[in-house]
Amino acid sequence: MNSFQKRIEEIYLERDRARGKQGTLLWFVEEVGELVRAIRRGERNNLEEEFADVYAWLATLASLHGLDLDAIGAKKYANGCPRCRATPCECPHPKPVV
């Protein structure tokens, strides 16, 4: 487990367990909404805070489900893109709409 997820557990795990998985999920979704708002509004000064909040709530959710974010991320992406196995990804993607 990475040090960030461990630190979030030290600070919040007991409180998050008491809130439960569903309640914690709602907080996570709210934080994702705040991040989306900051990105859409171009609020550069809020991005660090909102990214950190989303990362913390994601770490908490993983912990509540008994998952190690670092391990599952490394496992899924160890061989590059999970679909084409290339690094960088060589999957055909439509051009982004601007």
Task: Outline where the language-model segments fall.
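Flexible "arm" and connector segments at domain edges
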Residues: M1-F51, Y55-V98
